[in-house]
Regions:
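Anionic coordination/interaction segments
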Residues: 1-373, 381-400, 405
Length: 407
């Protein structure tokens, strides 16, 4: 795998050409507040806080190439078929491994990634930057579109993120029944989903979590039309990679509409726009989990312009760089950069544990004493201030006879 990676700085940042051609590739994103995500080169993966609180449908490694359910952003150029800036359309997938496959590049660092795609056929370049601010439970997609032709082009844009909104247990246990608990509303900024109850092995519990997808232009302009359920968005006979709504231009519902009892969709349409030669525009998608509508509104106000998002991205990059404060200097610069990621692993272990990445899908989020002790050993070098409390808190949970020490 390393032969495909080109390291681009001294902090482990790298780029990969046509990353969608690499199987089982995904990237971790997380905050210190609890939100944990995995994101693939075509923006598959999932997002969650814990076993019982999944924003996006839970995935394991085999789901990475099986699932169509993924984060997406569609651009429709006037007079042409729709285009996915994530590469997740039926047409773009069919073009893969042929001379019609478009150029793409993934650039990534600690807790952020940027996907760049070039459509020669449609004459524009798009980028999607994904990250989670260190202190908030919101995943941010920052999308840019730049006209590369010599003529003015007209476009329409759609944000589209399926909202799972419940426990991982419900993937096969009461999947249909729990969708009937969904209470969905459209707001000025997007879609909120608040199931009436959680329904898992703990029993029937009243639910207060709100799963949401908000969107705006880089200038803070709201969507104009909304698609709050999967059926609304994909249409009769449609799929996530070939949604009838986008292909046939169906109009959605207005803000302040209600839906219930169906699989939820965080999808909306923006006002059409034109780009002069060389002109660029941008959009922001915010997806997350909150305890109140006020919290969602505060998050939106915090990240509703391109400048705010760029500042948050820079803060996120600086924060995680500072955490990995060990440098390596050998005769092989690539090895030195690779070792930065080895040093970053204990932080990922602390945040994700054994249960919340596609190849680490065992258990329900718990970590045994052996795991915690191994993490503490490496953190003694990287973050010694926190290790004493981690050891004391971990020992406090071990039974006197040691019978739960590795559970």
């Amino acid at each position: 795998m390393l032969k495909h990676i080109k390291f681009i700085d001294n902090h482990g940042s790298f780029c990969v050409n046509r990353p969608e051609n690499t199987s089982y590739l995904y990237f971790p994103l997380a905050s210190e507040a609890g939100l944990k995500s995995s994101v693939t080169p075509v923006l598959g993966g999932d997002s969650k806080i814990d076993q019982d609180t999944f924003l996006l449908e839970p995935v394991s490694s085999e789901n990475l190439h099986n699932n169509r359910s993924s984060r997406n952003f569609w651009i429709v150029k006037e007079g042409h078929i729709p285009y996915s800036v994530t590469g997740s359309s039926a047409q773009q997938e069919a073009n893969r491994f042929t001379d019609r496959q478009e150029d793409s590049e993934l650039t990534a660092g600690f807790m952020w990634q940027t996907l760049k795609r070039t459509s020669r056929e449609l004459g524009f370049i798009s980028t999607v930057t994904s990250f989670i601010p260190k202190s908030d439970n919101v995943e941010i997609m920052y999308v840019t579109v730049e006209n590369q032709t010599d003529t003015v082009q007209k476009f329409t844009a759609y944000g589209a993120i399926p909202v799972y909104g419940r426990s991982a247990d419900n993937i096969r246990d009461h999947r249909n029944v729990t969708s009937m608990l969904h209470r969905i509303e459209t707001t000025e900024h997007g879609i909120n989903v608040c199931p009436t109850m959680s329904f898992d092995e703990r029993g029937h519990q009243p639910n207060h979590k709100i799963y949401y997808v908000n969107g705006c232009s880089g200038k803070g302009e709201n969507p104009i039309s909304y698609y709050p359920t999967v059926e609304d968005f994909i249409g009769e006979g449609g799929t996530y990679t070939h949604p009838r709504t986008v292909y046939e231009g169906y109009k959605g519902v207005p803000a302040h509409s209600l839906a219930a009892g169906k699989e939820a969709m965080g999808a909306f349409c923006f006002s059409s726009f034109t780009l002069a030669p060389g002109e660029k525009t941008d959009f922001i998608l915010l997806s997350g989990i909150a305890d109140s509508k006020e919290e969602i509104e505060n998050i939106f106000e915090k990240y509703n312009t391109s400048d705010k998002v760029k500042n948050a991205l820079e803060e996120t990059r600086i924060y995680w760089k500072k955490q990995v404060n060990v440098d390596f200097h050998t005769q092989d610069p690539d090895f030195d950069s690779y070792m930065k990621w080895i040093s970053f692993q204990p932080f990922l272990r602390r945040l994700f544990g054994c249960s919340f990445l596609p190849h680490h899908d065992y258990g329900r989020g718990g970590r045994g004493w052996r795991d915690l002790w191994q993490d503490c050993l490496s953190l003694l070098i990287l973050d010694p201030k926190e290790v004493r409390s981690m050891i004391l808190n971990s020992f406090a949970g071990v039974r006197f006879d040691g019978t739960n020490a590795t559970i």
